[in-house]
Curated annotation (Swiss-Prot):
Domain ABC transporter: start-end pairs: 7-227
Xref: Pfam families: ABC_tran (PF00005)
Membrane-related topology note: Peripheral membrane protein
Described purpose of this protein according to its UniProt entry: Part of the ABC transporter complex LolCDE involved in the translocation of mature outer membrane-directed lipoproteins, from the inner membrane to the periplasmic chaperone, LolA. Responsible for the formation of the LolA-lipoprotein complex in an ATP-dependent manner.
PROSITE patterns per record: ABC_TRANSPORTER_1 (PS00211), ABC_TRANSPORTER_2 (PS50893), LOLD (PS51244)
Quaternary context: The complex is composed of two ATP-binding proteins (LolD) and two transmembrane proteins (LolC and LolE).
CDD domains: ABC_MJ0796_LolCDE_FtsE (cd03255)
GO terms of biological process kind: lipoprotein localization to outer membrane; protein localization to outer membrane
Protein name listed in UniProt: Lipoprotein-releasing system ATP-binding protein LolD
């Protein structure tokens, strides 16, 4: 693994037991992401893309191989240590934003900082600044139900970025957005990859989004290949 990689995996595999059979979903995967790099993973439905994201993010355990996040081998860490590492070094954005409906945009973005024991005044200050950066400074007190789809996704991205992680993973981030809003999300990722050196790993069916990334990888037959 390169010392400069924010994420790396070697010989990564995942299989499941179904009765007497072993079903191989992923096998022998190799991947490295570096600061500021934007990589898209494409593939057909059921090819294992979500399984791969869960393995790379430490939400699932591989059947074989290893994953390193921010220089730490995930399999060598206990559950609590993995959780702390994810909160510090990794942001995650889902297709369905997963914002907490009872909290405002500002409170949702504050949440990772508060989990990391940042003082409330500092958390609010940093979260306000980041929401202003993504064009939502006028929507701080609005709850998710009061925001448009694009606004909710920008709040989710701000929440993923608030701890200044080296890597953000996105699962179909523009799947429910109109073209104009989706392009705004793409432009935001491009800007942040340059200004903050944040790496982005994106799973998508949207080839127009994938083609704007630095690299496109296809997941087929359980392996990653250059698309």
């Amino acid at each position: 693994m390169s010392d400069k990689a924010v994420l790396s995996c070697r010989n990564l595999g995942k299989s499941y037991e179904e009765g007497p059979e072993s079903v191989v979903v992923l096998s022998g995967l190799q991947l490295e992401l570096h600061p500021g790099e934007r990589v898209a993973i494409v593939g057909s439905s059921g090819s294992g893309k979500s399984t791969l994201l869960n393995l790379l993010g430490g939400l699932d355990t591989p059947s074989e191989g290893s994953v390193w996040l921010a220089g730490e081998e995930l399999s060598a860490l206990g559950e609590k240590a993995r959780g702390l590492l994810r909160n510090r070094a990794l942001g995650f954005v889902y297709q369905f934003h997963h914002l907490l409906p009872e909290f405002t945009a500002l409170e949702n973005v504050c949440m990772p900082l508060l989990i990391g024991r940042t003082a409330i005044p500092e958390a609010r200050k940093r979260s306000t600044a980041l929401l202003e950066r993504v064009g939502l400074g006028h929507r701080l007190a609005h709850k998710p139900s009061e925001l448009s789809g694009g606004e909710r996704q920008r709040v989710a991205i701000a929440r993923a970025l608030i701890n200044q992680p080296g890597l953000v993973m996105l699962d179909e981030p523009t799947g429910n957005l109109d073209h104009h809003t989706a392009q705004g999300i793409q432009d935001l990722m491009r800007e942040l990859s340059t200004s903050s050196r944040t790496a982005f790993l994106i799973v998508t069916h949207d080839m127009s989004l994938a083609r704007q990334m630095d690299r496109v990888l296809r997941l087929e037959d359980g392996r990653l290949v250059e698309a």
